[in-house]
Regions:
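Primarily recognizes the serine-hydrolase "nucleophile elbow" in alpha/beta-hydrolase
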Residues: 239-301
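Active-site machinery of serine-nucleophile hydrolases
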Residues: 98-104, 111-127, 169-215, 341
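Secretory targeting and sorting signals
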Residues: 1-38
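Domain-level recognition of soluble alpha/beta enzyme cores
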Residues: 49-157, 365-369, 380
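Short substrate-entry loop that stabilizes the transition state in hydrolases
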Residues: 138-154, 159-197, 315-318
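Alpha/beta-hydrolase-fold serine-hydrolase catalytic core, especially in secreted/extracellular enzymes
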Residues: 37, 49-60, 67, 78, ...
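Alpha/beta-hydrolase active-site loop
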Residues: 197-255
Length: 411
């Protein structure tokens, strides 16, 4: 679901802030129409506003037994030219690494995003003069910068955000997985987000979005969108080389077990998970959270590797997005197709928590922030526990009374 607020009148600043945060990442989502521009405005109802100025939101605390740390890597792939802006030179990646940490170590809580990145997200919705970008950028996280890693070696999970969406929107899931004993690498793909601020201060905007918008019809837009997950597969193969190869870029690379690698993504990032698995045998398992398969799953399947499709209901139920029906037929390993009642496209990101804390109610996605967070964390973690650790995952065996919103699709 894409929510457009560009032409929506607003009242008090607190209400506008809440509305804006629902659209933090909504440039392009699961369908070509939404990829080419804003969808018609969705009716949004603000809850009763609390008096006073809004305060920075706080992400839900991770539930695992580990404290979490965060490092950031800025990597350059000198073997590839950037596909969206060739004049920029080699392809570059900005990567957040969340990892299990020793308690009591590290510095301040890691930042959510920069103020400029927040401003660009709000500007895309015409709200940069209404919502303080600093409020969005100051969202409170739980990982500590430069914390000492916990002893041991841990499976690696790669995370890829939606098209036009910063990697920050998957921070809550990254921290949860790290607290459960995973190293998590979340990538910003240059020129595929509203704004990515590099360590030297440069800001890269969404040239890929502009290219999609410039196409004359849906078929042409789909062709460009199919290049996004295919290109991200190259990004993640390069990232795997730099994290697990003989000359690793990360100082704590010894904590990664390279024999156990999974990948999850939101929206087109979920398609990138299957594309990366198709291109790189090192990725053992994948999750698509509500993303259309613009780059189809291979006809031959994924060599028996497990895959979870987790989406909105009915938006990604059988027959709603035919790319999911096609992918389901091609997946040749252990697989599950789950949909979530009352959810929206951004249910699987940090957006519900941020919006709800600022008093937002979205009639088209009435699932609460708490349930959105619990469902996403529980099912994604259960899948990786099963696929990368060989642990029983009863949650994935069928419907449970504790999660009545989660539907098991068996087309």
């Amino acid at each position: 679901m894409t929510i457009s607020l560009r032409n929506r009148p607003v009242g008090v600043a607190a209400t506008a802030a809440a509305l804006a945060l629902t659209a933090l990442a909504a440039l392009a989502t699961a369908a070509p129409a939404s990829a080419s521009g804003p969808a018609p405005a969705t009716a949004l109802a603000p809850a009763s506003a609390a008096p006073g100025e809004p305060t920075a939101p706080t992400l839900p605390r991770p539930t695992g037994r580990y404290a979490t740390g965060r490092d950031t890597l800025f990597l350059t792939d000198h073997t590839r030219t950037d596909p969206w802006v060739p004049a920029a030179g080699p392809r570059q990646l900005l990567v957040s690494l969340n990892y299990p940490a020793r308690p009591g170590t590290g510095g301040d809580p890691a930042p959510y995003m920069t103020e400029e990145e927040a401003r660009l997200m709000l500007a895309q919705r015409g709200l940069e003069d209404v919502v303080p970008p600093a409020l969005v950028g100051a969202t409170r996280t739980h990982a500590r910068t430069a914390a000492r890693p916990a002893p041991g070696r841990f499976p690696l999970v790669l995370l890829s955000p939606g098209f036009g969406t910063p990697r920050a929107t998957l921070t809550g899931l990254a921290e949860e997985l790290a607290s459960r004993g995973y190293v998590v690498a979340t990538a910003d793909h240059p020129y595929e987000s509203t704004g990515t601020q590099l360590p030297d201060g440069r800001v890269l905007t969404c040239a890929a979005c502009d290219k999609v918008d410039a196409q004359p019809d849906d078929a042409a837009r789909r062709e460009v969108l199919a290049a996004v997950p295919a290109g991200r597969a190259d990004d993640f193969s390069f990232l795997l080389d730099r994290l697990t190869g003989p000359d690793p870029a990360w100082r704590h690379s010894r904590t990664i077990d390279p024999r156990r690698v999974g990948m999850a993504g939101h929206s087109i990032g979920g398609n990138a998970a299957s594309s990366t698995m198709a291109a790189d045998r090192r990725v053992d398992a994948g999750v698509n959270m509500d993303g259309t398969f613009f780059d189809p799953a291979p006809v031959r399947g994924l060599d028996g590797r497990p895959f979870l499709m987790l989406g909105t209901d009915p938006g990604h139920g059988p027959g709603s997005d035919t790319s999911w029906d096609d992918a389901w037929a091609r997946l040749d390993g252990w697989k599950r197709w789950l949909t979530v009642r009352d959810s929206g496209h951004f249910t699987f990101t940090d957006t519900p928590e941020i919006g709800e804390q600022l008093g937002l109610e979205d009639p088209e996605a009435p699932l609460s922030a708490a349930r959105s967070t619990t469902i996403t964390r529980s099912y994604v973690t259960a899948f990786f526990d099963r696929s990368l650790r060989g642990r029983p995952a009863r949650l994935l065996n069928g419907p449970t009374p504790a999660n009545p919103e989660v539907l098991f699709q068996r087309p």
